Amino acid sequence: MSDVEHLKEQAGIAACRFVKDGMLLGLGTGSTVRYSIIEIARLITEEGMNLIGVPTSEDTRRLSEELGIPLLNIEDSGTLDLTIDGADEFDHNFDLIKGGGGALTREKVVALKSKSMVVVADHTKKVEVLGAFDLPVEVCLLYTSDAADEVDG
């Protein structure tokens, strides 16, 4: 495992310190959160915690199912206790950009339904000025042509 991958693993596991028995959890998307999901599965199987996840992407859904984490769909979940998600980049003010992995809309909905949110990222995601990573763009299907006009200028 590379040094960066080891940092991601440590960060992902550390984020799970906020997880308590009986929680309904938003499960984010990305390479660092993957380690949080693995740790959540361990908390269920080895610690006996009763946890349910709400995935923010199909990748997260597949991994969670493989690991045996019980899941609910976003629309069936109600209020979530905690969401753990990653960031594409963050600055010295802890402003951040996320959603570059293609799950922006679901990540936003899950975050809005959560009482609390932990954003997990290692130092490699820190930038002086936001915008080093490609900026995700969210388009609602009802306004596709309007959005295309805006992007084209």
Q: Which residues make up each language-model segment?
A:
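Short, flexible, solvent-exposed loop/turn segments with mixed acidic/basic and small polar residues
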Residues: 41-42, 124-130
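Short, solvent-exposed beta-strand edge segments and adjacent coil->beta transition regions
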Residues: 132-134
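Single conserved hydrophobic/aromatic residue that forms the stacking wall/gate
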Residues: 143, 147-153
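Single, functionally critical "micro-switch" positions that shape active/binding sites
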Residues: 29, 121, 148
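N-terminal active-site beta-alpha-beta segment that forms phosphate/nucleotide-binding
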Residues: 2-85, 90
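Ligand-binding beta-strand-loop-alpha-helix segment within the catalytic cores
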Residues: 51-126, 138-145
